Design a protein with these regions (language model features):
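Short, glycine-/small-residue-rich phosphate/pyrophosphate-handling segment
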Residues: 52, 57-81
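Active-site nucleophile and cofactor-binding loops and adjacent substrate-binding regions
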Residues: 46-52
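A contiguous loop/helix-start segment that scaffolds small-molecule binding in enzyme catalytic cores
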Residues: 6, 11-20, 29, 34-36, ...
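Hydrophobic beta-strand scaffold residues
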Residues: 44-46, 64
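Glycine-rich beta-strand-to-loop/alpha-helix junction loops that act as flexible
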Residues: 1-6, 19-23, 48
Length: 167
């Protein structure tokens, strides 16, 4: 589905461009799509978008780093369908206490909170942003102690990003 082919101008995956599939370009199918287009000798152009992490920070009017608090941002996902490499499990990453953006995890929020609590503490701020940068975006702010109840009240099930950290 590429410009120059009959009746097709753009290819979108899940309502997003391939590089921002499900608002998580690092987990999108763009690599597979590029290989297929090249194999078929079909010209294409990739137009980059704004990452979900940047969109969420902007929407929340918040920075992701702050001197003396956190100077590192970790972008990850919660591994349930694909195994995470050794050392990249959430509890390993949480040891850094950096600002963390967790993709594809809202359905596993109880497990995520359990892995974060020992490292960040119950009072650590957390935001769950549903459909960031879409007209119907919504979000919940809380702490690791109360976020599960707040998210359950909103019934977020998919297309949500979790931002955690003291910034």
């Amino acid at each position: 589905m590429v410009a120059g082919h009959p009746g097709v101008k753009n290819h979108f995956t899940n309502g997003c461009s391939p590089s921002t599939k499900a608002f998580a370009p690092q987990y999108g199918a763009i690599g597979e799509q590029i290989r297929e287009l090249r194999a078929l000798d079909i010209p294409f152009e990739i137009i980059p978008g704004v990452t979900a992490t940047a969109a969420c920070a902007a929407m929340l009017e918040s920075e992701l780093t702050l001197p003396g608090v956190a100077q590192t941002v970790i972008l990850t996902r919660y591994g349930t369908t694909s195994p995470m490499p050794e050392g990249e499990q959430l509890h390993d990453l949480a040891r850094h206490r950096a600002t963390m953006a967790i993709h594809l995890g809202v359905r596993q929020l109880p497990a995520i909170v359990a892995e974060l609590l020992p490292h960040y503490g119950a009072d650590c701020p957390i935001a769950v942003i549903h459909r960031a940068s879409w007209p119907d975006q919504d979000w919940v702010l809380g702490t690791l102690a109360d976020i599960q109840e707040k998210v359950a009240a909103k019934d977020f099930r998919r297309t949500a990003l979790i931002l955690v950290g003291r910034v």
